[in-house]
UniProtKB/Swiss-Prot annotation:
Belongs to the EXO70 family. GO terms for molecular function: phosphatidylinositol-4,5-bisphosphate binding. GO terms for biological process: exocytosis; protein transport. It comes from Kluyveromyces lactis (strain ATCC 8585 / CBS 2359 / DSM 70799 / NBRC 1267 / NRRL Y-1140 / WM37). The keyword Glycoprotein does not apply. This is Exocyst complex protein EXO70. It comes from the Eukaryota.
Length: 619
């Protein structure tokens, strides 16, 4: 055996160790590869499991969160279902207050739902939110339908029937008013408030318009024909205006009842409601004004009535902010211009009619012009109210004719009083003055064509007694018409005093010849200091008696031909003649009756006999 070097032995041992180590390392490397392969496979297998697990964790969280959310709104859903049951029924069945209360509750639940979920869109409960909103929408729509039904409980009607029977226009009872107020209160702070107010206005305007439509056809014409004079009160505008004012008053009350808690809104709603009604009324007024303008001669007096109606409407709108009122006032001004012309035209008409009288009536009575003119003046007086409102913008000079020969009976006090009532009294007094002036002028022109016309002076003129009698007869008729018509109240005490002044003037005309007769009996002193009458003076006394008797019998004969139908005038004239003639004759008779040896030879009448004759002359 050979010996081995120790170092070599170490190398051999180390080399063997390295071989073993290399083999081990190779085995470890193979094992690690297997482990790596196995780990990779395991990793591939666990990745979807982890994802699923993560998804399950998320799902578990969502389920738990949803369960928590459902638990949090479960009470709201239960509460909402109770109120939904109410809203699914009719208002008439469940009652208005419970119905409105249910809508409020649903609205509160919706608001609470938003707060609990801390989300503005409440997306996880979008279906529930949508359903609640739909419930509120449907509920409010049903309220509007019910409100409309309440409004329509009063349907259009013919207001003329109610006015004829003096029945008030239909109005809602307290229950309906209360229900409508509840609905309006509900919508007060709602976005649909304007919509419910518009519904209210629309339905009320519809009711009024369709009701007034029954009367509107009668406003299209003023009289039954183009040449037919207007009869007071016959225009359909009167009924239309009366009905419209009734409706307007009703609407004012209704708005106050429904908006009693919101007084500031009342004028606004009233104006919106009335505006279309007044607009249609304006069309009617304009149409009638044009008719007046086209046929003033026959229907002109209607302008006073129309003015009254327009004034009534304007008074009802006073203080209300309604733009149409200004247009209506402009129409009133135009109508009153037509009325102003009627005042002037009446005097032109009087002048034309009196000048058309060709001669005095054979009985010295009332001619056709007097009857016609007084009829026109009487008709004028029927429109007292309209005349008063029209004349306040006029002066007396606007109707007086430019004729210097006229002696007006108006007093200074009347001239200074510029009130409407006094101006109207002056107008009617002037018209009567002008009528009698025209009659007197024509009487003098026809009876005394060769003589100057005396109208302003107190000079005597031919046929003065007959003319006086003629004028007294006419004044008697005028007086009767005055007493039986509105002229009496229009004239008043000052105007009636003017008639009395005319009566005295014409009585003086009538007794003028009697006054001349009595002047015969005015004597100088015929009796001497011894109480005797000289033969020369006796002849003068005889002549005076004879002249008086002749004149007396002539006047008696003439006076007996006059027929007086007015008992009051008979009495006045008889008294005037007796008081004028009898005292003078009695004085003269008593003074000279004993101057003659045979008195009856020269003295035809004793005072009592004279009085008996005088009593027979006025028939």
């Amino acid at each position: 055996m050979s010996s081995i070097d120790i170092n070599e032995a170490d190398v051999i041992v180390l080399s063997e160790g390295l071989k073993k180590l290399d083999s081990l390392y190779s085995e470890m490397s193979q094992s690690l590869k297997k482990i790596s392969s196995t780990t990779s496979t395991a990793s591939q297998l666990f990745t979807p499991i982890l994802k699923k697990n993560q998804q399950l964790n998320i799902l578990q969280y969502n389920i738990e969160s949803s369960l928590n959310s459902v638990a949090s709104v479960k009470d709201l859903a239960n509460d909402a279902s109770k109120h939904e049951i109410i809203l699914e029924q009719s208002i008439a069945k469940v009652g208005l207050k419970p119905y409105i209360n249910a809508i409020h509750k649903i609205d509160d639940i919706l608001e609470d739902l938003n707060e609990r979920t801390h989300s503005n869109d409440t997306s996880e409960f979008a279906g529930m939110v949508t359903h609640l909103k739909e419930l509120i929408f449907d509920g409010e729509r049903n309220l509007q339908i019910y409100f409309n039904k309440l409004l329509n409980s009063i349907q259009p009607f013919d207001p003329q029937i109610n006015m004829n029977k003096k029945i008030p226009f239909p109005y809602y009872d307290d229950e309906y008013l209360g229900q409508m107020s509840l609905i309006l209160d509900y919508f007060e702070n709602s976005t649909q408030n304007a919509q419910i107010v518009d519904l209210f206005i629309k339905q009320r305007v519809r009711l009024i318009s369709q009701s007034l439509a029954f009367l509107e056809p009668f406003t299209k014409q003023i009289s039954s024909g183009p040449n037919v004079p207007y009869q007071k009160g016959s225009s359909g505008v009167n009924s239309y205006t009366e009905a419209m004012l009734g409706f307007i008053a009703n609407e004012n009350s209704l708005i106050q009842d429904l908006y009693s808690k919101e007084t500031s809104r009342q004028p606004v709603i009233y104006a919106k409601l009335c505006s279309p009604i007044i607009q249609n009324y304006l069309k009617i007024i304009r149409h009638n004004r044009q008719l007046l303008k086209d046929n003033r001669e026959n229907i002109g007096l209607f302008s006073f009535e129309l003015s009254d109606k327009v004034n009534d409407v304007l008074r009802s709108l006073r203080g209300k902010d309604i733009a149409e009122a200004d247009y209506l006032n402009s129409e009133l001004i135009e109508i009153q211009r037509i009325s102003h012309s009627l005042f002037q035209e009446l005097f032109a008409y009087i002048n034309t009619k009196t000048r058309s009288m060709s001669q005095l009536p054979s009985d010295n009575g009332v001619p056709e012009p007097t009857v016609d003119i007084m009829s026109k003046i009487r008709k004028f007086s029927e429109y007292k109210s309209g005349c008063l409102s029209t004349i306040q913008a006029m002066s007396r000079s606007q109707w007086l004719p430019k004729d210097p020969k006229i002696s007006w009976t108006i007093t200074k006090n009347q001239l200074e009083d510029l009130s409407s009532a006094n101006l109207l009294s002056s107008f009617f007094g002037d018209a009567i003055d002008y009528l009698l002036f025209g009659l007197e002028r024509r009487a003098q022109e026809t009876l005394n064509p060769q003589h100057e016309i005396h109208l302003l002076s107190n000079k005597r003129f031919p046929n003065i007694q007959r003319i006086g009698f003629f004028l007294l007869n006419n004044l008697s008729l005028i007086d009767q018409i005055v007493q039986r018509s509105e002229i009496n109240s229009i004239l008043g005490s000052a105007g009636l005093a003017r008639l009395e002044s005319l009566r005295k003037k014409y009585i003086n005309y009538y007794v003028s010849d009697w006054r001349d007769l009595t002047s015969i009996l005015l004597d100088q002193i015929f009796v001497d200091s011894s109480g005797k009458v000289s033969s020369k003076e006796k002849d003068q006394i005889k002549e005076k008696f004879k002249k008086f008797h002749d004149g007396f019998e002539d006047l008696v004969s003439r006076s007996k031909s006059y027929r007086i139908s007015d008992p009051a005038l008979k009495k006045i004239l008889r008294q005037e003649i007796l008081s004028l003639v009898l005292p003078m004759y009695e004085r003269f008779y008593n003074r000279y009756k004993d101057s003659f040896k045979h008195p009856r030879k020269h003295i035809k009448y004793t005072p009592s006999e004279l009085m008996n004759v005088l009593n027979t002359i006025i028939k």
